[in-house]
Curated annotation (Swiss-Prot):
InterPro entries noted in UniProt: Rootletin-like_CC
Polar residues bias (residue ranges): 464-483, 1989-1999
Keywords, in A-Z order: Cell cycle, Cell projection, Cilium, Cilium biogenesis/degradation, Coiled coil, Cytoplasm, Cytoskeleton, Phosphoprotein
Protein name: Rootletin
Modification comment: Phosphorylated by NEK2 which may regulate its association with centrosomes.
GO biological process entries: cellular homeostasis; centriole-centriole cohesion; centrosome cycle; ciliary basal body organization; epithelial structure maintenance; establishment of localization in cell; establishment of organelle localization; photoreceptor cell maintenance
Region feature Disordered, mapped onto this chain: 464-518, 1184-1226, 1443-1575, 1962-2017
């Protein structure tokens, strides 16, 4: 476009030079004209007109109405405007030529007179030829003749040169060749005429030799003129060249667009391929979990059987106890004295165990109650059995009580610490009370003392049995213990212990009736001794846990402070987001990114659904396990405090998550700012590069996902570091032997850091890791067997500890079963947090919604606190259920029933939460898209304030209705149009530079806009090369730094290895601690593996992203370094890794393989260290080596790719060394902090340089993606192998199970717990990529589970009765709360969207009003121009009157004669050219041309010849007007056809609206059973139908009015026949005309106020405006007739002129009606699509909502695009209207002059008749145009009807699907909001249709008035013809007095002019046809575009239907694929 502008400037300068040359020539002619004959005069007179005609045609011909690309229109418009200016200049030159011709006529007359006198003198006085006076006359005549001949020769030379130039440029101007040939023919004729004149002058040359010299000089002058003509030809050639350049520029733009489109298509295909791969992975993963679930079910069935067996044993034991009761009664006196001593001993023992018994106070109190109950049960066995049943009922009632307690504890969430303290005080009080009651019972009486002694003995023995958990073999061997059990049989265990796995089945239960007192006391003392051992051991653990509690509480306080700081940051970010809603284009890109995120969420949701299914099954198993865990109530109570501490840790973790969320907010906001900078460069190619914009949006979305993944990885790393700290503290407090495991954990933490850095490179490692999982499981099996052997050796020494460990393991089984879900749920939590970050950016100005998001985040934090060990609690955190879960755990709900019910509740509510969150994200994305026009990127606006200072004035006008980028683009388009008027070439250059800058910014989205613009303008290639060189240097520097870090890391590895060796050496002596810690380590490995799997998926998504994520990673590194200095090294390595990953996927695979080798090496080291204790691990190591060999095969396959990309081998080696180095960097992080910080700062400064290398990476993206697909396939194969290995491990597990059954019952329970543990490890060890992150979560969850178990036992009795009520009320409250939240969010989001839409419509309305004001001003200018035209017409007629001999002087300045609507006589070539259809169509923005001047050649003596010439020109003008009338009639018929098409299209729109109403009604029928609030939609549709019927009635009324107006037109024709008697009333009518003009302005204002809805059909407006210009004077008369209906349309020429303006407005309204119908269709389609997608969302999933928003955004974008295009065309129409008004003003002045001249009434009548004929022709043309428009409307309506039918069918299908879903109630409120929006839309459509009908009626009325005006004009034209005939008769009389030669010349001249006029009319007709064809093609193109859009929408809707069908399932079960 810049080139086109420059070319326009050059053309302007060249034409200006030519015109100046012509002016100078004319001036010279005026100074030196001599006497010439009439023949010469006639010949030269037409020459200026011919020159002007040639130039005009050459300028206008290239601008024929050929369909130009949309991108060329601006250039052509500016070029045409320049041509208009040049034509005006030519008009001025022609005026000068006309004046010179008049002077030449005078000189010719003088020459004739002098010649006659000379001839007379020669005849009368032949002897006096040498006298002075004749000689003077001869010289004078010779001089005059010489000057004339010189001028003729000059013109001839110019014409000849022009002909030659045209021939030389024939190939470049093929389109002008025909006209050039005509011009050559004309020149030849002129030359022939000159030769003839030369022959005539030969006689004079015989009389005077000087005559021949004069002729020769004249020939020379003619040649000079021909040379000038050649220069004009050169100018034309230059113009054509510039047009060619503009065309080539447009072609280049088209090529760029195609390239971008191809890129976008390729990216879409790649994305689809990745989605397919992800789905395959999900299917395999779901299959794996299904298998594991089956195994868990089998295992827990065995557990249930075992529980039943234990229950039976308990019943037998109770019978024995009843028998022992009688024996104890007989020996009570003997035992009394021993009881006193025993009481003393017991109090002493209890004082020593006080620390442990403090946490068992509540259970002790319950045991006291049970002791008293058992005294009563001794009397009656039936009563005891009944009590046992009551206990069971109470146990089942606890669940309900716990549910009630949950609701109460929700209110006490903030006071949880105080509650814990109060509970501790209560426990102490209960303990003291128990002691007092015990003392009272002992001293009360002997019988009471004996009973108390028996109860205490039984309590002690039972407690000892519950803690010790003796094996069956031991109990068989120890007879005394059996006796004691028999003795204690009278006391039944507490209900919580009946089915506890901690209580084994007694192999013998024989009573001991003869048991002596001494034996009883001995047994009691032995039991107490064992109990004391247990108490001491628990005391040690308690002290350690207290230390850890202090540390964790401190950390919790720190995390709380950090959380508050993060909340403040969140508030600040929220304030910043208020101005971040201005990027409409960014919102579109966000739509794409959200779509990809939605797909990812869908996949994650599927995985989570499967995990939830497994969790549900595990919950059911935990319910069965509940009674087994009751024996561990005392230990769980002691662990309660620890659980609270872990919960505080969870709070801290939540705070950390929020900090990460805030960092992600800042990073994403930075990315948004930078993307807004990119959007500013899309101005010139906005329409063509929409697909490229979508592609870049996808890349940016991937970049955000990479940033998210890095944030998640860093969060995991921080959690792992915290876990390491906790583990170290625990190890220090427990035993020195745990230092080895601390070192091991430390090493694992280092490995985790490495894995986090290489998370994107480990995708191919999954199969190998799964093999390692199998080996690790085998190792675990061997270790377990060794542990069992060790336990057998030290069984008697550590009976108490084994019992406690058994209880813990039983509790950990549930925890481990739940730990599997933790990584997945954390991943889901991270994604939800990312959504929260998006909400923080999007919910500007909506504090309420943002507060809800904060509450959501708070609920997530609380869920993390309360759910720690249980992984489903994380999901409840997202669902807002974590608060209730944690509170219920603190209150002591049982692990079984409570877990099952809450999991079921979680399952239903979690799915709802996920759906609501996704819907919230989608709705917020929609809201952001609608509001981003003025609010989205305030931060970006601040950063670009300096740069956009020059553009703000242009942006302010549209800032409220579009985003900052969108406004900049629109303003740049306007500015480009303005610049196109001055410099087309400069605009082209700027356009190319913008394209290049856009491409580069698309590749480097993070760079600053200032540097990017400076670089991309001139030095892109050079700087790219320099940056590549610097990248290599940077790589070398990084390699050196990596080498340095590697050395330190190696040292750290050596230290870690030494620590591991020490730990292994200590492990032999500390087997029990090792066993406990080994279990923790296994759990950590399992959790870490799950986390590694999540990170691997994140890495896979990052690998597929564009490498522009380096900026986001850099920002993430900066934030993480500020929080933790240790994270700096990890982030730096992550940045380098991502950079290397962007360069080569093969490098990543190699690095992945190397890292896998390192992990294998570490695993070998660990296995070698364990060889000293576990010889059975050799087999596991052998299998590991086999898996490694398989991995080697994969590495060899990867080596093929690595060899092809061998260039990065050195860099991969450096990365490996850096990974090894960073393993030791954890210990040395403090010392390395400063150096790493400096290094990171240097890297950040150089990242800009490194980013340039991504240009080359884009070329390799295709190959890398192919390699990634191969890797994915290999990973799937490895997964299948892993499943096979898992099946083998299951077989090994069954063998281990058989071995475990051979052990004692206590060891059997341990084996059972270990089998459950193995199930968990097999799930987790195969996913070791999340190694250390899961370790921290494992530790936290373990502690929380212990505390939860303890609390469950403590609160069991208290909440037994309230649990049922609380559960019921809690479920209802949660459902109600969730529904209310969902409803509120949906309503708020939709309200915001409606407000944004209303604001946008308001802005458009204001813009339309501004445009209406502009049109009003243009109308005023047209009025002035009309008056000027009227004055010119008056001047012309005055000249004619003077020419008829009335004695009037010629006008001082010739005025244009509007003999035709826009054409003049042939001599007025410029007028012809200017008014050509080409110019009108292609130069809407140009200034109106100067009308052709009407020469006034009348001499002072009123030469009849001059009068005759003027009359001849007038006659020619009349004929031209007649021809134009015919053309206008044709155009009127075309308009009529268009009108018919528009009406048909309107009918189609009506029918489609009815179909839409039917579709909505069907949707209402489907949803009426769920929610009756949607019935309003049907009411709205009824209103719409009513409005349609009303519109139909109005249309019929309009047709009637049209018929009436036609009849009125006929009456007007009869009235115009009598207009001669009414011409005297013209003065009075003039005043009415002014009033009509004012009313016309009002009508124009009313029409312009609706132009904002009429923009889609402005393409056809140009053709209409062209025809309006051709018949401007006629339309002005029609406008007058429109306003002067009261006077029965008795108007003359002025009436026709006014009606012409009215006709123009009618045409605009007609086009507006069509555009309004189109936009109504588009808006209706968009709203229907929105309703459809809303229905799909409420029934299927919230993904449909996001797609709906995307579709709506696309529609809005397309609408905005069309609006801008039509805005340009409207500007052109405004220019045309301004020109028309100016011409109308000129014509008005002419009419006034005619009214003042009563003597010319006869001539005026004749002219009016000619104009009437023209008007009739225009009317015909209008009718044809209306018919074509109606046809077009009909077609569009048919298409819209089809679209509506399709949408209706889709809606019905969605409604049926929706009826099958259970969650439709939650979506009903959202649908209500959509219904309101649809109501508004339907109202809007109704209003638009009403306006359309009004416009149609108005158009019909105006058409009728135009017909009547045409009739009157025809009458006036007939009268003018009669007057012309009279004038011709006079001319014939005058011609008789002239020579025959002059008559012949005049005839030839007239014939030539007639031929030219015929040619001109033919070209105009052809051009009109081309215009119609162009409009038809444009219409078809629009139809095809709509069809494509419909097909695209259908495809997307089907895809969303398939996608949405997956997440929905019945709420009672987990969702399935």
């Amino acid at each position: 476009m810049s080139l086109g502008l420059a070319g326009a400037q050059e053309v302007e300068l060249t034409l200006e030079t030519v015109i100046q040359t012509l002016e100078s020539s004319v001036l010279c002619q005026e100074k030196g004209l001599g006497a010439r004959d009439l023949a010469q005069d006639a010949q030269i007179t037409s020459l200026p007109a011919l020159i002007r005609e040639i130039v005009t045609r050459n300028l206008s011909q290239p601008e024929s109405p050929v369909l130009l690309p949309a991108t060329e229109m601006a250039s052509l418009l500016s070029l045409q405007e320049e041509n208009q200016l040049l034509q005006q200049e030519l008009s001025r030159v022609e005026d000068l030529l006309a004046q010179s011709r008049a002077e030449r006529d005078e000189l010719a007359i003088k020459y004739n007179a002098v010649s006659e006198r000379l001839e007379q003198a020669l005849r009368l006085e032949p002897g006096e030829l040498e006298t002075q006076e004749p000689r003077g006359l001869v010289r004078q005549s010779v001089e005059l003749r010489r000057q004339l001949q010189e001028e003729q020769a000059s013109y001839r030379r110019k014409l000849q040169a022009y002909q030659e130039g045209q021939q030389r440029q024939a190939q470049l101007v093929q389109r002008l060749q025909g006209k050039i040939l005509q011009y050559k023919k004309r020149c030849s004729e002129l030359e022939q005429q000159l030769l003839e004149r030369s022959g005539e002058l030969e006689q004079q040359r015989l009389r005077d030799t000087e005559h021949s010299q004069d002729l020769e000089s004249a020939l020379i002058r003619l040649e000079e003129e021909q040379q000038r003509s050649a220069s004009l030809a050169q100018v034309n050639a230059m113009l054509r060249e510039q047009l060619d350049q503009a065309g080539s520029a447009n072609q280049a733009l088209s090529e760029d667009i195609r390239k971008v489109t191809n890129d976008w298509t390729r990216c879409r295909k790649e994305l689809e391929h990745r989605e397919a791969a992800w789905r395959r992975e999900e299917e395999s993963f779901n299959a794996y979990f299904s298998n594991e679930h089956s195994r868990l079910l089998l295992l827990w069935r065995q557990v249930v059987g075992f529980r039943r067996l234990v229950s039976e044993v308990k019943m037998f034991t109770e019978r024995d106890l009843l028998q022992l009761g009688g024996e104890l009664a007989r020996t009570s006196r003997a035992v009394q004295e021993a009881g006193l001593g025993l009481s003393t001993g017991l109090r002493l023992a209890e004082s020593r165990a006080e620390a442990a018994l403090e946490k068992q106070a509540l259970l002790q109190a319950q045991l006291e109650e049970q002791l008293r109950d058992k005294v009563l049960r001794e009397k009656d066995l039936a009563q005891q059995q009944m009590q046992s049943d009551l206990d069971k009922a109470d146990l089942s009632a606890r669940v309900t009580e716990l549910g009630l307690a949950v609701k109460r504890l929700e209110k006490q969430n903030l006071e949880k610490d105080q509650v814990n303290k109060d509970l501790t005080e209560k426990l102490e009080a209960l303990e003291s009370l128990r002691l007092q009651e015990q003392a009272a019972l002992e001293t009360e009486d002997g019988e009471g003392l004996q009973q108390t002694l028996r109860d205490l003995a039984q309590a002690v023995l039972s407690d000892s049995e519950s803690g010790v958990q003796l094996s069956g073999s031991e109990r068989t061997a120890d007879a005394s213990n059996g006796s004691l059990r028999g003795l204690s049989g009278q006391r039944t265990p507490s209900p919580p212990r009946r089915s506890s796995p901690g209580r084994g089945r007694s192999p013998r239960r024989g009573p001991s009736p003869a048991c002596s007192d001494s034996s009883t006391l001995a047994l009691i003392h032995s039991a107490l001794h064992k109990r004391q051992l247990q108490v001491q051991d628990m005391r040690g653990r308690y002290e350690a846990s207290q230390d850890l509690l202090g540390t964790l509480r401190k950390q919790l306080s720190d995390s709380e402070s950090e959380r508050r700081a993060l909340e403040e940051q969140l508030q600040r970010l929220r304030d910043k987001t208020d101005g971040a809603m201005q990027a409409h284009e960014d919102a579109q890109r966000e739509v794409q990114r959200l779509r990809s995120a939605n797909e990812l969420l869908s996949r994650e949701k599927s995985n989570l659904a499967h995990s939830l299914q497994v969790a549900q099954q595990q919950a059911e198993e935990l319910r069965q396990e509940r009674e087994k865990l009751q024996a561990a109530q005392e230990e769980l109570r002691r662990q309660r405090d620890r659980l609270e501490e872990e919960q505080e840790d969870a709070v801290q973790d939540g705070a950390r998550v929020r900090r990460e969320l805030e960092r992600s907010h800042r990073q994403l906001e930075q990315l948004e700012g930078k993307r807004s900078v990119l959007a500013k460069e899309l101005v010139e190619v906005r329409e063509a590069l929409s697909r490229a914009t979508l592609q870049r949006d996808m890349l940016q979305a991937e970049k955000a996902e990479v940033a998210e993944a890095l944030t998640k990885a860093e969060a995991g790393r921080v959690e792992l570091e915290l876990s390491m700290t906790k583990l170290r503290a625990e190890e220090a407090s427990l035993q020195d032997s745990l230092s080895k495991l601390s070192a091991l954990n430390e090493s694992l933490a280092q490995d985790k850091l490495d894995l986090n850095r290489l998370v994107a490179q480990l995708e191919e490692e999954k199969s190998a890791l799964q093999g390692r999982q199998r080996q690790a499981e085998q190792e675990a099996t061997v270790a377990r067997e060794e542990q069992e052997r060790l336990e057998e050796l030290r069984l008697e020494q550590e009976v108490a500890r084994q019992g406690l460990e058994g209880s813990l393991r039983v509790a950990e089984q549930a925890q481990e079963a739940l730990e599997q879900q933790l990584p997945t749920l954390r991943h889901e939590r991270s994604q939800l947090q990312e959504q929260l970050a998006q909400l923080s950016r999007q919910l500007s100005g909506r504090e309420q919604e943002l507060e809800q998001a904060r509450r959501e985040a708070q609920r997530q934090v609380e869920a993390l606190e309360r759910a720690a060990r249980e992984k489903e609690a994380l999901a409840k955190e997202h669902a807002g259920l974590a608060v209730q879960l944690v509170a219920a755990e603190r209150e002591g709900r049982t692990l079984s029933e409570e877990a099952t019910r809450l999991r079921l509740e979680k399952e239903a509510l979690e799915g709802s939460l996920f759906e609501v969150q996704r819907q919230l994200a989608q709705l917020e994305a929609r809201r952001e898209q609608l509001e981003a026009e003025g609010q989205a990127l305030l931060l970006a606006k601040e950063t670009l304030t300096g740069e956009l200072a020059g553009l703000r004035q242009q942006i302010i006008a549209t800032q409220e209705k579009a985003s900052l980028d969108k406004e900049l683009m629109a303003q740049k388009l306007v500015q480009a149009e303005r610049e196109a008027q001055a410099s087309l070439r400069e605009q082209r250059a700027a356009h190319e530079e913008d394209l290049q800058r856009l491409q580069r910014e698309k590749e480097a989205a993070w760079r600053e806009l200032e540097a990017e613009r400076a670089q991309l303008q001139s030095q892109l290639q050079r700087e790219q090369e320099e940056l590549l060189a610097r990248l290599e240097a940077e790589k070398e520097e990084l390699s050196e730094e990596i080498a340095a870090l590697q050395q330190e890391r190696d040292e750290g590895l050596l230290l870690a290895e030494s620590e591991k060796q020490q730990a292994l050496s200590l492990k032999e002596s500390e087997k029990t601690a090792l066993s406990e810690k080994l279990m923790g380590t296994r759990h950590s490995l399992a959790t870490i593996s799950l986390e590694m799997e999540r990170q691997k998926r994140d890495a896979q998504s990052r690998q597929e992203q564009d490498r522009s994520t380096v900026n986001a990673l850099t920002s993430e590194l900066r934030d993480l370094r500020a929080q933790r200095e240790e994270a700096a090294a990890a982030h730096a390595q992550e940045v380098r890794r991502l950079q290397e990953q962007a360069r080569d996927l093969g490098k990543q695979r190699d690095s992945c393989l190397r890292e896998a080798e390192e992990l294998r090496t570490q695993l070998r080291l660990l296995e070698d260290a364990r060889d000293g204790l576990r010889r059975e691990l050799l087999e596991a190591q052998r299998k590991l080596r086999e898996s490694q060999e398989g991995r080697e095969v994969q590495r060899q396959e990867a080596g093929e790719l690595r060899r092809s990309l061998g260039e990065g081998a050195k860099e991969r080696e450096a990365l490996r060394r850096s990974n090894e180095e960073l393993r030791s960097a954890v210990k040395k992080a403090e010392s390395e902090r400063i150096s790493l910080k400096l290094a990171n700062e240097d890297k950040e400064q150089k990242l800009a340089l490194l980013e340039e290398a991504r240009t080359a990476v884009g070329k390799e993206a295709g190959e890398l993606r192919t390699g990634l697909q191969e890797v994915e396939r290999s990973r799937l194969e490895a997964r299948r192998e892993l499943q096979e290995l898992r099946r083998q491990m299951k077989m090994l597990d069954s063998e281990n199970t058989r071995l475990g059954r051979e052990l004692a019952e206590l060891q059997g329970r341990l084996a059972l717990g270990e089998r459950a543990e193995k199930e968990s490890r097999r799930e987790t060890l195969g996913l070791r990529q999340r190694l250390l992150k899961g370790e921290a979560s494992l530790e936290v969850m373990r502690q929380e589970l212990q505390v939860a178990q303890r609390k469950l036992q403590e609160q069991e009795g208290e909440f037994r009765t309230r649990e049922r009520r609380l559960l019921g009320s809690l479920e209802e409250a949660r459902g109600t709360e969730k529904q209310q939240l969902d409803h509120a969010r949906g309503l708020e989001l939709k309200l915001e969207a409606a407000r944004a839409e209303a604001a946008e419509l308001g802005l458009r309305l204001s813009a339309a009003e501004g445009r209406a004001q502009g049109l009003e001003a243009e109308l005023a200018r047209v009025e002035v121009q009309r008056r000027a035209a009227e004055a010119q017409l008056g001047g012309l007629r005055s000249a004619l009157r003077r020419g008829l001999g009335l004695g009037r002087a010629p006008s001082p300045a010739p005025r244009p004669v509007p003999g035709s609507p826009a054409r003049d006589a042939p001599a007025e070539g410029s007028g012809e050219g200017l008014n050509s259809p080409s110019t009108l169509e292609c130069s809407p923005g140009s200034q109106p041309p100067s009308p052709g001047p009407a020469t006034s050649p009348a001499s002072p003596d009123l030469d009849p010849e001059a009068v005759r010439g003027a009359l001849r020109e007038f006659l020619q003008e009349l004929r031209s007007a007649q021809r134009e009338r015919d053309e206008l009639r044709t155009q009127t018929s075309a308009l009529n056809r268009q009108l018919a098409e528009m009406e048909a299209e309107r009918d189609s729109a009506t029918s489609r609206a009815r179909q839409l109403q039917k579709a909505v009604a069907e949707s209402e029928e489907a949803r009426r059973s769920v929610d009756g609030r949607l019935s309003g939609v049907q009411a709205e549709l009824a209103l719409q139908e009513e409005s349609v019927r009303r519109s139909e009635r109005e249309r019929r009324a309009t047709l009637d009015q049209v018929a009436t107006l036609e009849r009125s037109l006929q009456a007007t024709e009869s009235e115009l026949r009598a207009s001669q008697e009414k011409i005297s009333k013209m003065k009075a009518n003039e005043t009415k005309l002014e009033g009509d003009k004012r009313r016309l302005k009002e009508v124009l204002d009313a029409s312009e106020s609706r132009t904002v809805k009429l923009e889609l059909q402005r393409r056809s407006l140009e053709g209409e405006l062209q025809r309006s210009r051709l018949g401007l004077s006629d339309r002005e008369a029609q406008a007058q007739a429109l306003q002067d209906r009261v006077d029965s349309l008795q108007r003359q020429v002025a009436d026709s002129e006014v009606k012409a303006g009215t006709l123009q407005l009618t045409v605009e309204r007609l086009n507006g009606a069509l555009a309004k119908v189109e936009e109504s269709e588009g808006a209706l389609r968009d709203k229907v699509r929105g309703l459809t997608e809303a229905l799909a969302q409420s029934s299927a999933s919230l993904n449909s909502t996001r797609d709906k928003n995307l579709h709506l955004q696309k529609a809005l974008t397309a609408c905005e695009h069309d609006r801008q295009v039509l805005q340009e065309r409207l500007d052109a129409a405004r220019q045309a209207l301004s020109e028309a008004r100016k011409q109308s003003s000129s014509l008005g002045e002419q009419v006034q002059t005619l009214r003042g001249e009563v003597a010319d009434l006869e001539l005026q009548r004749v002219e009016a008749e000619g104009q009437l004929q023209q008007l009739r022709e225009v009317l015909r043309q209008r009718q044809e145009g209306e018919a074509a428009a109606l046809n077009t409307v009909q077609k569009l309506q048919d298409e819209r009807r089809l679209l509506q039918e399709r949408l209706g069918s889709l809606q019905r299908a969605l409604a049926q699907l929706e009826a099958e879903k259970r969650e439709v109630e939650r979506s009903a409120l959202r649908l209500e909001k959509d219904r309101v929006a649809l109501r508004r839309t339907l109202d809007k459509v109704e209003r638009e249709k009403l306006r359309s009908h009004e416009d149609t009626v108005r158009l019909s009325a105006e058409k009728g008035r135009l017909d009547r005006t045409l009739t009157g004009a025809e009458l006036e034209l007939a009268e003018a013809q009669r007057q012309i005939q009279q004038l011709e008769a006079q001319v014939v009389v005058l011609e008789q007095s002239h020579s025959p030669a002059q008559l012949e010349v005049d005839a030839q001249q007239q014939q030539l002019e007639l031929q030219q006029e015929v040619e001109r009319l033919r070209s105009a007709q052809a051009q009109t046809e081309r215009t119609l064809e162009a409009r038809e093609r444009a219409h078809r193109q629009r139809v095809r575009g709509l069809e494509e859009q419909v097909s695209t929408l259908k495809g997307q809707l089907q895809q969303e239907l398939r996608r949405s069908s997956a997440p929905f399932s019945p709420p009672s079960g987990p969702p399935e694929k």
